[in-house]
From Swiss-Prot:
Keywords: ATP-binding, Glycerol metabolism, Kinase, Nucleotide-binding, Transferase. Glycerol binds at R83, E84, Y135, D245, Q246. Gene3D superfamilies: 3.30.420.40. This is Glycerol kinase. Sn-glycerol 3-phosphate binds at T13, R83, E84, Y135, D245.
């Protein structure tokens, strides 16, 4: 049977999705299933790994049934995933020994403090391109081995496996036959040397993580193994692409040349700039990460991670009851006319790039008796754009590249007000693509290249198309005045302490 589709599994922080893409890179079917969040203590976030797998199986079945697709028409599977989230499981039974510790979780912050006090920061930065932070997988694995009785000894005997979510999915889909990850996910663990492209013995010793439990690190586009027959009605489908969600979005946005950048507006906000074959060391609070590894060549990116973006609108809806639904934020923001001097710094879990301050709380500034709900909503939406400018300023400083345009994706970019304000505050055109599902599309492209479904990156680049281009339309003095107000608000937030 002719191969007509590539299947992308997009395993995110709150839901799992399965999506079919045709040869034109258009969505041919989608299924989605949410799963539970576990909050054992304030600041801790965990997932049940078995529930994640169930959500993935369910979406695959729903997708094939609803789209009435024969599994033989699927050329391959691409996997993209919430990065940094760590799972440790028993190799013999396939059962997790503890919940998955999620990227957002701060439960390893004390370990991070100890590592910093021991003087490891410079070494970690040079080898991994990362900072010592609870965000990354390494301290999460250490925490599990420290807190589950007998776990470290079992890991040393080769009885336990560690993986980011991509590894966990592939292990299960192949019936425990394949234990791999790709360069992009490995580069987010704080255990992988992005220059030698190997697990680093010095980093593993620092964290006391046995090498026996680690997955093989492979390219982002190759055939890793075949699925078991029960998932695709008796057929075996090759798993042929892996990338962490933000790198997958960079690939799905066809940012193939150095200096091209994308920003994803989801729960958090993640801007990546392709730096080609150069691992650019950041002096401005950004991360150096692997963009992808294809055809024996690794390419790098600079990344700015903003912890709270779209979730500030969810907070207005669920926490403050200011909105009926998140999409109402556009109408409220437009109705306000301006922010009336109100700024929201949404440091609910501290601030990410370029500040990296986990010790501060969110704040609101500039309230008067004339402040309305509309002003509040507008300030929340504007905070996404201001934080993005913080990151872009750092990115241009590190790379020496002046951004010509910003390709944008994620749920919040559907908000026309936010997209236009982003263009205005950056003074750079913002491009919204026709296919909004760029993360899943990137995973599909990686799998399609490995299976011959698509012939080259040039072919993929021709498929990328603009839905709408937002051009800057704000006077420079107004732009600089608004941003100066934001900088003042951030500085004041950093000075506030709860005793």
């Amino acid at each position: 049977m002719e191969k007509q589709y590539v299947l992308a599994i997009d395993q995110g922080t709150t839901s799992s999705r399965a999506m079919l893409f045709d040869r034109q890179g258009k969505v041919a079917g989608v299924a989605q299933r949410e799963f539970g969040q576990i909050f054992p203590q304030p600041g801790w976030v965990e997932h049940n790994p078995r529930e994640i797998m169930t959500s993935v199986y369910t979406t695959i079945t729903e997708l094939l049934n609803n789209a009435q697709i024969d599994a033989r028409a699927i050329a391959g599977i691409g996997i993209t995933n919430q990065r940094e989230t760590a799972v440790v499981w028993d190799k013999a039974t396939g059962q997790p020994i503890y919940n998955a510790i999620v990227w957002q979780s701060r439960q390893t912050k004390d370990i991070c403090t100890q590592l910093k006090e021991a003087g490891h920061e410079q070494m970690v930065r040079e080898k991994t391109g990362l900072l010592i932070d609870a965000y990354f997988s390494g301290t999460k694995v250490k925490w599990i081995l420290d807190h589950v009785e007998g776990a470290r000894e079992r890991a040393q005997k080769g009885e336990l496996a560690f993986g980011t979510i991509d590894s966990w999915l592939i292990w299960n889909l192949t019936g425990g036959k394949v234990h791999v990850t790709d360069y992009t996910n490995a580069s987010r663990t704080m255990m992988f040397n992005i220059h030698t492209l190997e697990w680093d013995a010095e980093l593993l010793a620092m964290l006391d993580v046995p090498a026996q439990m680690l997955p093989d690190v492979r390219s982002s586009s190759e055939i890793y193994g075949m699925t078991q027959t029960q998932y695709f009605y008796g057929e075996q489908v090759p798993i042929a692409g892996i990338a962490g969600d933000q790198q997958a979005a960079l690939f799905g946005q066809a940012c193939f040349e150095p200096g091209m950048a994308k920003n994803t507006y989801g729960t958090g906000c993640f801007m990546l700039m392709n730096t080609g074959d150069k691992a650019v060391a950041s002096k401005a609070g950004l991360l150096t990460t692997i963009a992808w590894g294809i055809d024996g060549k690794v390419e790098y990116a600079l990344e700015g991670a903003i912890f709270v973006a779209g979730s500030v609108v969810q907070w207005l809806r669920d926490g403050l009851r200011m909105l009926g639904k998140a999409s109402d934020s556009q109408a409220y923001a437009e109705r306000a006319g301006d922010n009336d001097g109100v700024y929201i710094v949404p440091a609910f879990v501290g601030l990410g790039a370029p500040y990296w301050r986990s010790d501060i709380r969110g704040a609101v500034f500039g309230l008067t008796r004339g402040t309305t709900k509309e002003h509040f909503v507008r300030a929340a939406v504007e905070s996404m754009a201001y934080q993005t400018r913080d990151v872009l300023t750092a990115m241009q400083s590190d790379s020496g590249i002046e951004l010509k345009e910003l390709r944008a994706d994620g749920g919040a970019i559907a908000n026309d007000f936010m997209a236009q304000f982003q263009s205005d505050i950056l003074n750079v055109p913002v491009l919204r693509p026709e296919v909004a599902e760029t993360t899943a599309l990137g995973a599909a492209y990686l799998a399609g290249l490995a299976t011959g479904f698509w012939g080259s990156r040039e072919e993929i680049a021709k498929q990328w198309a603009v839905d709408r281009r937002f051009e800057p339309a704000m006077a420079d003095d107004k732009r600089q005045g608004l941003y100066a107000g934001w900088q003042q608000a951030v500085e004041a937030t950093m000075g506030f302490r709860i005793s």
